[in-house]
């Protein structure tokens, strides 16, 4: 199971098949796929900070470039799409590769999970008109074991291996951490996730840290762009509300 698949399974409700409202889900899945490529020995990083790098240097890891060392297909639709994105932009910074992968990451991962019998694809129509697709669990055994592992790390204080640490770092800030534990344990779990996400460079491989840094940088960029769009939209609405019509109507007539 890929790290990206683990992330997506945690985001999809087992019973309803609905995907949670996750902040920049596609970007986070793309970062996970980048880490999965490194774990599969498909890529190396150029220009990445080394072990012992300062916090400022680590934060710039998303500017490292990705060198594909093995371009043979993996047979996994999402992983191969991510590999192709890296091949298509050999000189682009990792954060740009994350953006490219994010465009179809969720769709590809869902298809892979359905193909392997982990999820089911249910299609229906809302009000007999609007198509709706849900992805309820078909086999939740892996997710059950995954949640148990995450609980040990987030609540019981167990040290994560690189794979689990990477997943938690990507989950941090997504809004999903609180749903992994009981209500009374949420604050502690979120604090533990923040601790792991901000841990020293040596906790994971350079490639994995680059994937995480690229994801964080891309999430921040998307967030700023979204905020700017909202502000501009609000300003436009206010301008429209206060604009004087070119041809004024009589006082008793409603203002357009």
Q: Predicted regions span which residues?
A:
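Short, amphipathic alpha-helical interface elements at domain boundaries
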Residues: 1-105, 229-256
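Charged/polar, solvent-exposed surface patches and flexible loops
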Residues: 9, 81-88, 99, 111, ...
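Short, structured motif recognition centered on aromatic/hydrophobic residues
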Residues: 34-37, 109, 113, 166-175
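Short glycine-centered helix-capping/turn motifs at secondary-structure transition points
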Residues: 41, 117, 175-179
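Short, amphipathic alpha-helical interaction segments positioned at domain boundaries
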Residues: 61-108, 128-166, 177
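Amphipathic, coiled-coil-like alpha-helical scaffolding segments used for oligomerization/assembly
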Residues: 107-121
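Short acidic alpha-helical/loop segments enriched in Asp/Glu that coordinate divalent cations
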Residues: 120-129
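Short hydrophobic helical membrane-anchoring segments positioned at the boundary
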Residues: 151-256
């Amino acid at each position: 199971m890929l790290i990206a698949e683990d992330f997506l399974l945690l985001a999809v409700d087992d019973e309803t098949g609905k995907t949670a409202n996750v902040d920049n889900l596609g970007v986070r899945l793309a970062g996970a796929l980048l880490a999965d490529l490194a774990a599969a020995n498909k890529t190396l990083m150029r220009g990445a900070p080394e072990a012992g790098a300062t916090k400022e240097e680590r934060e710039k890891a998303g500017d490292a470039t990705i060198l594909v060392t093995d371009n043979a297909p993996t047979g996994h639709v999402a992983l191969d799409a991510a590999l192709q994105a890296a091949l298509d932009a050999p000189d682009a910074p990792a954060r740009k590769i994350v953006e490219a992968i994010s465009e179809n990451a969720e769709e590809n991962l869902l298809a892979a999970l359905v193909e392997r019998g982990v999820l089911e694809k249910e299609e229906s129509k809302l009000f007999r008109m609007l198509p709706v697709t849900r992805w309820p669990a078909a086999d939740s055994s892996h997710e059950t074991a995954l949640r148990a592992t995450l609980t040990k790390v987030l609540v019981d204080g167990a040290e994560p291996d690189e794979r689990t640490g990477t997943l938690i770092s990507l989950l941090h800030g997504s809004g999903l951490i609180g749903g992994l534990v009981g209500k009374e344990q949420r604050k502690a779990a979120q604090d533990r996730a923040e601790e792991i996400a901000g841990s020293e460079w040596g906790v994971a491989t350079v490639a994995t840290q680059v994937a995480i840094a690229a994801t964080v940088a891309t999430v921040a960029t998307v967030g700023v762009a979204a905020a700017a769009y909202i502000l501009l939209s609000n300003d436009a609405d206010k301008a429209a509300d206060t604009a004087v019509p070119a041809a004024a109507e009589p006082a008793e007539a409603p203002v357009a």
